[in-house]
Every structure is written in C-alpha cells, then in structure tokens.
C-alpha cells in the first residue's frame, strides 16, 4: 500500500508529521507523529508552586496565557486542598475571564486567517476569495492589524504579551486602575467593530454567496464567513469525519455562582453529560504504548511520574502520549465546547455541516467562528463587572504547604490540564495534558487511533504533491506545531517542498 509522509504539517513551529497509507487515492490508515521531546514538567520539580506558572507559561508562544493560568489554578487547588488558601478574589476571576476571552478572539483570528484560512484563499486554492490571500489580501492584513490590538490589550493587564508576568497563583500581581480597564475595553471595542454585529451573520452569508461585500456589516465578519463559504463549497463537510465524542473542561467562571459560561462535561452516544471537576479528573488517563516513554510515564496523571523517555520501544512513533477519557478518544476544541453547551448559533453546523454535533472539517471551522462571536459579546460584560477599588490578589497566598491539585482549563484549542503535587513547599510531581495530545496523539494500547488518525481515514488524496484535503483536515484541529511542508512519496523521495506561501507563488513548491 503506498505511503505518504507529510512533515511538518502546519504553517508555524513544526514538530508534527503525518504518515498515511493510501489505496486508490483514499487514506486507509494514518499515524500522527509528534517529533520533539519537551519535558517541561521536569523543569518544575524541586521548585515552589508559584514558579510553575512562570515556567509552564513558556511551554507555548501561542497558548502562553493559558498554561500560566492553568498552572496557577493547579497551585491554587493544591493550596485549597491543603487548607491554607480560600481562593482568588472576585476581581481576579473576572479579569482572568476577560483576559482569556480576549485571548480567544486573538487566537481564533490567528487560526482562521493565518493558519487555516489560506487553504481557502484564491492564492492557494483558486477560490476567488482574494481577501484571504496571505500577505496581500485585505482581509488577511486587516486580521493582523486587529490581532495586534488584542495583544496590546493583554499586555496592559499582564505586563507584556506574549508571556505575561502579571497572572500568578492567588490572583493578579498588579492592581489595574479604572483607566487601564477603560483602555483595554476601548481596544476590545475596536476589534468588535471590525468583526461586526453578530446578528448580521445570515445577511453576510447571503452577501458572500452572491459575491457582494458590505463593509458596514463588518469587514472581519465578511472575511470569516468567506472562509466558511469557501470551505462548504470545497466539500469540507465530507472530510475529516471524527467519532462524534467530545470533552471540555469548561471555562469562564461566574465569580458569584461558580457556573461556567462554556460548561464542563462530555458528549458521547448522542447526548451531553455535564460533569463536576472531580468526575472529569477521575476519567482521564494517558497511554504510552506507542509513545517513546516508559510505561510508568502514563496511567493516572495525578500519580504518574514526569515523562521519562524510552527510545527502545520498537512500535513507538510519537513523543506525544495518548490521553483517554473512560478509555475513549475524545475530540476537544471549539466544536467540543459548543456541542456540550448545546449551542449552534444560527443553526450553521446543522444547515451546512450535516448536523450540530457532527465532527468534520467544516464544522470545526464553523464552531470556531461561532465561538469567537459568542465570547466577544461577553468580554465587555466581564470588564464592566471589575471593581478597581477591590483587591486583585489574595492576601493569604503562600507557597509553604503540602498538597495535590489539578488545574482544568480551556485554551482555544481545547482541554488543558495541569497536575501538581507539592511537598513542604516544593513541587514533587508535575504533569501536563495539552489539547493537541487529545486530538493528535498516537494510538493507545487497545489499537484505538487518536481523533486525527481516525478523521483522516477516508479523505481523498487526489494529488500526492498537493494533498490539500488532508492538510485541511489536519489544520482544522489547530495543531500547535508546524512551518514549511515536505511531502514524501512511496519511494521515500521528497516529491515536493512547500515554502511559505505568497500569493501567486507556484514554482518550486505546492501551495498547501
């Protein structure tokens, strides 16, 4: 059976490849391969709990805020379990909500316009949507301008962005005044005006389908809808079909009730199961059968030791582990959060993607766009609820305790969890399970493929030099890995090398 290797697979960073077994132009089997050992957990050992937020915040330059906040939540949970901490102040909860909401807007724009949008642009796919063209399209450049505004907003609270320093266990290390909050709100409103009104979505869809453009309805909204229309016309609803199992840690906590705007739970067997934090934690395990790690690096992440490499495993093919919930693979990300919330604004996934809970390449894009609009409409409310005269930092925070804690969080890519074991003020054990592990990990010991490995089966490969549908499926899961792409053919030779795409570029590379 012919074999194709695509390595790396995304437009930034690298360290992920996919090997496909193809027969009669259709993918029969896929292996998702993470190519780099990281071991960030090991660096935290022997340090005070507060240090973990500083260290793990550097795990990723994209999800920088998310790891920092998740680690802070793990430390806070451990301290509360030890009986030495009562929880962060109300202002800290609201500001974390607002900051993560701003991050969602920024990251969703990065994904839709820079990471996956070019796959549906005129320059890459001949769709006629030249506003999406990388580097030259008006929509692409407008998104970059508005992403910058959101990063500036995050920097006002965190001191800098990426890698802010203001968010710490116990709350916020700075005390934003009314003028700072107003400045952040002003930047968010500028981006909101670029996006346009949520209620205009049906009209904008009709405009895009008719080749019309009304900037008064929001330039950003027009371009996002263009991506969705181009994807629908390209048949994205018929590729990347997953098992329709979803999991979310939930996010955006109400400081008064503890309710989550995007709820915690799973979707399986056609129904939503809302869950407590303890129920979620109890259900999660990691499998290392096909990972270059020792067996005791897997299992229950609360007690497993930090990852220890094992390079002698003959059948291993990934530095990623295989997370499972109750023994099953689970898809995470915007579609998981909205399915569990039972939200399908304007019935877009139902109408265009074959069903609100259907896992496919198109619905992943639709859900991301829907979520951006949902969260946008909440961020200003969270900012308005902050009282700058009240504290942002708990006065009882201390690193001097013994306890175990778990931080559950939801970066834009999906479920993230940090596990921390503290002994006499020093970290004894640390584990991280990222969204990309859930979606793009390897098989488990039962032979069960990851979400990506399952979703790629059945995708057509019309051209080995340009497997565009395969790339669209991989990128729809927003893997946090990537850059220039190499496509390897059945004879082991590189058939094509893909350079960073510029509009109109074709010689020397294939536009994927």
Please give the residue ranges for each predicted region.
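Active-site bordering "gate/hinge" segments
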Residues: 1-413, 434-512
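Short glycine-rich, acidic/polar surface loops and turns
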Residues: 417
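Mixed-charge (Asp/Glu-Lys/Arg
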Residues: 425
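Catalytic-core signal marking the mid-to-C-terminal active-site face
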Residues: 428
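Catalytic activation segment of kinase domains across protein kinase-like and atypical kinase folds
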Residues: 431
